[in-house]
Amino acid sequence: MKTGEVRLWKLTRRHVREALEAGQIKGAILPTGSTEQHNEHLAMEHDAASALHVSYQAALELYPQVLVATPMNVGISEHWMEFPGTLTLQADTFAAVAYEICDSLRRHGIEKILIINGHAGNGPLGQRMDDFRQRLGIEVRFHSYWEAYSKEYIQEHMESGEAPAHAAEFETAFAQAAFPENVHWDGVDYEAANLDIQSESYRDRDPVYFR
């Protein structure tokens, strides 16, 4: 694979075949996220875009050893369905799709897969990794990208001291740095200290707000 490209969906079958035959590809990353409301100022693709951004940067650092599989852009978001535009899957459906993608990669000879998650609501998938490994016979792991940051780091660098929260300081800062075109401030009222534009009742409806 001499293209410098790590995103599977951008490659041709020849690119992938030659890289596999040469033994270049050692593993794959599967980004998982959501299409859901992120308050008034962040795009609905935020979680999926964040997971893809982290996955892409990691794979570039490891080129040509790692492929980025096609992202799962819809996740477990039932708790946000009252907000128009949100899409959701049942937990079993979400897990089944993730499993089938991992199995597809396995069938092509990839034996190490890292699921990089960008949506806290997808957390139940992490509890299925033992089952995935047993059934697939390969190494599969699940990590949410914000787990790379310690509590101490977050408290030092974030005014709110919270991560990932939901569409608050952490996610807004990530979007501003990675894809600023997805941040829309027009008409948005927020608390400058921590970008907390969410009411207490809004927080109460989010079961994963403080994860």
What does each model-identified segment do?
Residues 1-114, 118-211:
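Extended, histidine- and acidic-residue-enriched regions that form the cofactor-binding/catalytic faces
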